[in-house]
């Protein structure tokens, strides 16, 4: 809770006038407890998970749009029915309500312990961006090793096989997993803010962006505007789709966000081999088409 009764008091304490964003934040949060602000994450989680995958649900369910976007689908021969996608949504929401939501409600002491602040001044844009970069890097590295653990025989058979029920993943399948796996993978998500604690707004953004990134990675589509085209070492849907395509025996593409861990530790060799093979086949196909067209033109 902000320890100022009025905007004037806040301005005096900061020795400057509040920015319009700080004024907006003051008006919204001044009378709300830090616990209440922290619990906003539950609402953000439910809304993002429910709404962000909807465009792709529409694309998959509609024949006209499905044909239009089929060239961007990574596994074009696999069609997910509306009923299967809705079942996935219901199963994940059940897990959110019974496991993730209650955990959020009781985990506030950890936020107090690492000193996530909610007062003024607000962090600068550069501070927010720098912290988010740290969070993504820390999450990616630690998630990589947790994910590798889940692909050992015991971890896969006991827990991770549930997540791999979708060999052609969809957005709603991003958090579709055993409840124990969801809890364990929450550690990499929390570790970044624990190492570099910031403002509650930064924490909100982190949870939201991480959820959106996971949904995009499991979308099953590689669009021209996908982030992998613009962010170096970003894996994206095409990269992670290979991991699901190979299935339970996959020892490749473990990283959650970036590709550098798989490259450093040699767990992307199968993926790179497949990419190279597909590229060679594509080039041969082009050459064959040129020869055929050339022959027809010569006649």
UniProtKB/Swiss-Prot annotation:
Signal peptide: none annotated. Interacts with ACBP1. It is found in: Endoplasmic reticulum membrane. It catalyses: 4,4-dimethyl-5alpha-cholest-7-en-3beta-ol + 6 Fe(II)-[cytochrome b5] + 3 O2 + 5 H(+) = 4alpha-carboxy-4beta-methyl-5alpha-cholest-7-ene-3beta-ol + 6 Fe(III)-[cytochrome b5] + 4 H2O; 24-methylenecycloartanol + 6 Fe(II)-[cytochrome b5] + 3 O2 + 5 H(+) = 4alpha-carboxy-4beta,14alpha-dimethyl-9beta,19-cyclo-5alpha-ergost-24(24(1))-en-3beta-ol + 6 Fe(III)-[cytochrome b5] + 4 H2O. The lineage of its organism: Eukaryota, Viridiplantae, Streptophyta, Embryophyta, Tracheophyta. The chain crosses the membrane at residues 39-59, 96-116, 118-138, 189-209. Coiled coil: none annotated. It comes from Arabidopsis thaliana. Keywords: Endoplasmic reticulum, Iron, Lipid biosynthesis, Lipid metabolism, Membrane, Monooxygenase, Oxidoreductase, Steroid biosynthesis, Steroid metabolism, Sterol biosynthesis, Sterol metabolism, Transmembrane, Transmembrane helix. Disruption phenotype: Double mutants lacking SMO1-2 and ACBP1 are impaired in seed development, embryo sac development, male and female gamete transmission, and pollen function, as well as altered fatty acids (FAs) and sterols profiles. The double mutant smo1-1 smo1-2, which accumulates dramatically 4,4-dimethylsterols, is embryo lethal, with embryo exhibiting severe defects, including no cotyledon or shoot apical meristem formation, abnormal division of suspensor cells, and twin embryos, and is associated with an altered auxin and cytokinin homeostasis. InterPro entries: Fatty_acid_hydroxylase, Sterol_Desaturase_Related. Expressed in embryo sacs, pollen and trichomes. Observed in leaves, roots, siliques and flowers. It holds the Pfam family FA_hydroxylase. A motif (Histidine box-3) lies at residues 239-245. It is a multi-pass membrane protein. PANTHER family: STEROL DESATURASE. This is Methylsterol monooxygenase 1-2. GO terms for cellular component: endoplasmic reticulum; endoplasmic reticulum membrane. It is an enzyme of class 1 (oxidoreductase). Requires a membrane-bound cytochrome b5 as an obligatory electron carrier from NAD(P)H to SMO. GO terms for molecular function: C-4 methylsterol oxidase activity; iron ion binding. A motif (Histidine box-2) lies at residues 160-164. Acts as a rate-limiting enzyme in the sterol pathway via interaction with ACBP1; sterols serve as lipid modulators for gene expression of homeodomain-leucine zipper IV transcription factors. Together with SMO1-1, involved in the maintenance of sterol composition to balance auxin and cytokinin activities during embryogenesis. Its EC number is 1.14.18.10, 1.14.18.9. The histidine box domains may contain the active site and/or be involved in metal ion binding.
